[in-house]
Design a protein with these regions (language model features):
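A generic structural signal for alpha->beta connector loops
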Residues: 54, 59, 115-116, 141-142
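Short pre-active-site segment immediately N-terminal to redox-active cysteine/selenocysteine motifs
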Residues: 86-88, 93-96, 160
Length: 207
């Protein structure tokens, strides 16, 4: 073997070690990224768990959207105390939210179920725009509160609009859906959560 070949052999171990040192951080980064995505439900943000699940709904009191009516009656604002005693689907929405338009027909279908109540939190919106939105896409809300500064959304742990919560008869949050309601997640996640809440025993008076 020539002297040149000896030099190549002598240099190879060092070059291999350098390449290994470069690859280790990359492999570690990819492993952490894969673990992160797995914990987020394989990239599905609607599966991010909420710390509020199983806990009482925030004590939220919000004024009503002026001049909003449903079935000829004025729609009241949001009062968390009113959640107790019936299953409530609470939707956080805004007129400027494009996905909110897409989920509107599904919310209207939910509102037709007399076993539950659909309520809304109108997030950082203009009242006129909000009324026009509901006039165009329909008003599913038996109660709707205005959250002009976004404080209530923070209390509810909202990441962005739309988001939907299921609140049980005991006033505890039973389920949270991040992102718009779709036919798929309605059938596979939201409706089962609603049915589970409806099947739960009614709380005793005073609880």
């Amino acid at each position: 073997m020539s002297a040149a070949d000896n030099n190549v052999v002598e240099k190879d171990p060092g070059a291999w070690r350098r390449r290994t040192l470069v690859l280790i951080p990359l492999v570690a980064f990819l492993a952490l990224a894969a673990l992160f995505m797995l914990r987020l439900g394989a990239g599905d943000p609607s599966r991010i768990p909420s710390a509020l699940i199983g806990h009482p709904a925030p004590q939220t009191s919000l004024p009503p959207l002026p001049a909003l009516e449903r079935d000829g009656n004025a729609v009241p604002g949001i009062d968390s105390a009113a959640f107790k005693g019936e299953v409530t689907v609470l939707n956080v929405w805004a007129s400027w939210c494009v996905p909110c338009r897409e989920e509107a027909p599904l919310l209207m279908n939910l509102a037709a179920d007399r076993r539950l109540r659909v309520a809304g939190i109108n997030y950082k919106d203009e009242p006129d725009n909000a009324r026009r939105f509901l006039g165009r896409y329909g008003n599913p809300f038996a109660a709707n509160g205005i959250d002009r500064n976004g404080r209530a959304a923070i209390e509810w742990g909202v990441y962005g609009v739309p988001e939907t919560f299921v609140v049980g008869r005991d006033g505890h949050i039973a389920y949270k859906l991040i992102g718009p309601i779709t036919p798929d997640n309605l059938d596979k996640a939201l409706k089962p959560a609603i049915e589970k809440a409806l099947a739960a025993p009614k709380p005793a008076k005073g609880e």
